[in-house]
UniProtKB/Swiss-Prot annotation:
Catalytic activity: Hydrolysis of (1->4)-beta-linkages between N-acetylmuramic acid and N-acetyl-D-glucosamine residues in a peptidoglycan and between N-acetyl-D-glucosamine residues in chitodextrins
The family this protein is said to belong to: Belongs to the glycosyl hydrolase 22 family.
Protein name: Lysozyme C
Domain C-type lysozyme residues, every copy: 19-148
Organism: Pygathrix nemaeus
InterPro entries, alphabetized: Glyco_hydro_22, Glyco_hydro_22_CS, Glyco_hydro_22_lys, Lysozyme-like_dom_sf
Matches recorded under PROSITE patterns: GLYCOSYL_HYDROL_F22_1 (PS00128), GLYCOSYL_HYDROL_F22_2 (PS51348)
Note: Lysozyme C is capable of both hydrolysis and transglycosylation; it also shows a slight esterase activity. It acts rapidly on both peptide-substituted and unsubstituted peptidoglycan, and slowly on chitin oligosaccharides.
Cleavable signal peptide: 1-18
Gene: LYZ
Chain's role: Lysozymes have primarily a bacteriolytic function; those in tissues and body fluids are associated with the monocyte-macrophage system and enhance the activity of immunoagents.
GO MF annotation, one: lysozyme activity
EC number: 3.2.1.17
Self-association state and partner proteins as the record states: Monomer.
């Protein structure tokens, strides 16, 4: 009986945890969802961005105490401008989406919102991690061997 309880707790923790993509799995998924070359941003740059923003984790969150906003999901999309978490003062919600939708294992909503973000004048430069880790770097390693 004790073993069943422990097994149940282990399984529960696994089901609650977000999906952490493998690099090539993410590259293939992003390509299928139309991000390769979207607004001039290569697939390798998107994978690099996701690596440094979230470690490929769909359930990643990061609270920003300065403006009381939170970054959500695989692309760390911010609640101040892009999604609605019902808590961020003065939020814009430009993607017209609940922030919790950005934490799903199915990343279609996160990709749709990322397309909205990159369509703004700042483009992919909106992501600090991209500027710090991907901009002006050889990012080909992020899709190497993925067959994409």
């Amino acid at each position: 009986m004790k073993a069943l309880i422990i097994l149940g707790l282990v399984l529960l923790s696994v089901t609650v945890q977000g999906k952490i993509f493998e690099r090539c799995e993410l590259a293939r998924t992003l390509k299928k969802l139309g991000l390769d070359g979207y607004k001039g941003v290569s697939l390798a740059n998107w994978v690099c961005l996701a690596k440094w923003e979230s470690g490929y984790n769909t359930e990643a969150t990061n609270y920003n105490p300065g403006d009381e906003s939170t970054d959500y999901g695989i692309f760390q999309i911010n609640s101040r401008y892009w999604c609605n978490n019902g808590k961020t003062p003065g939020a814009v919600d430009a993607c017209h989406i609940s922030c919790s939708a950005l934490l799903q294992n199915n990343i279609a909503d996160a990709v749709a919102c990322a397309k909205r973000v990159v369509s703004d004048p700042q483009g992919v430069r909106a992501w600090v991690a991209w500027r710090n880790h991907c901009q002006n770097k050889d990012v080909s390693q992020y899709v190497k061997g993925c067959g994409v």
